[in-house]
């Protein structure tokens, strides 16, 4: 599985997920500098927190 890794809405960078991390995720939240995005490979989908504006977990290549 490969997942996007850059902190932008449009992302060309991907990484191959290590063994045991078979979920791509994308988390968005607002800061004083504007919207922040975090993307990576994870073993379990993180919980949605009240500070997040969106949370996406998926299992197909570059779906985040």
Curated annotation (Swiss-Prot):
GO terms for molecular function: acetylcholine receptor inhibitor activity; ion channel regulator activity; toxin activity. CDD domains: TFP_snake_toxin. InterPro entries: Snake_3FTx, Snake_toxin-like_sf, Toxin_cobra-type. One of its GO terms (biological process) is modulation of receptor activity in another organism. GO terms for cellular component: extracellular region. It is found in: Secreted. It comes from the Eukaryota. Keywords: Acetylcholine receptor inhibiting toxin, Disulfide bond, Ion channel impairing toxin, Neurotoxin, Postsynaptic neurotoxin, Secreted, Toxin. The keyword Disulfide bond applies. Expressed by the venom gland. Disulfide bonds join 3-24, 6-11, 17-41, 45-57, 58-63. Pfam families: Toxin_cobra-type. Produces peripheral paralysis by blocking neuromuscular transmission at the postsynaptic site. Very weak inhibitor of the endogenous nicotinic acetylcholine receptors (nAChR) in the human rhabdomyosarcoma TE 671 cell line. This neurotoxin is lethal to zebrafish by injection at the back of the dorsolateral region, but is not toxic to mice by intraperitoneal injection. Belongs to the three-finger toxin family. Ancestral subfamily. This is Long neurotoxin MS5.
